[in-house]
């Protein structure tokens, strides 16, 4: 059984244990994609989507009302940065916001301890990815993305990955056909609005699962969910001192299978306290293990 691993701090793990719901669920914070650690991450995903749009339009022989032309038209009088700012602001206003939780396929990775594991003083939590469910009858406000009965957990695709084109084709081809139908129904003066709407939807479908190839070593998986009408958006200050938005995502506590204690943590005493708490909350068969990474702090 393959697991996915979430690197975090001991204080976050303590908070998860202290706030287990009456339904025996952890309450995780899924952060807005626009609030991720790398502020350019979403824009990178957008650029990959834009390249796909241009390639698709050439292959399909689409000559008029190209969705990708919104970029070239806007750049005639504005900078790339101005367009990016306008585009993200529009997505914010229309609440087209993917919320994500990052995991990895690697349970004990030196660079991941450094980047996400509090410089080796955190933990890596191993979860089964099945049974991550939301209610089927939940809705999304003003957005043509339908939720399935499961929260989406997918491998992140790194640019130039051999299966990236397949992912984009599956995710975006139907959306482009919907755009053409809407574009043909509207007058020219309304085309920009239609383009912005569909470009936004295409981007939020694909961008949560695309990262720069420099991050391929993370072997990341992402749990992504799109804001529903009844989801309450909350706010907090992250470890970098930035204000971010998030929504709460329940994950059954039974999905927790392992806890790897970071290489710079006192393993014996931490393991003892964790075992007491796991017994208190009636966890079954959670393996607590010590990192094997020879980690040096600076």
Where do the PLM segments sit?
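Partner-binding and oligomerization surfaces adjacent to conserved cores of proteins
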Residues: 1-298
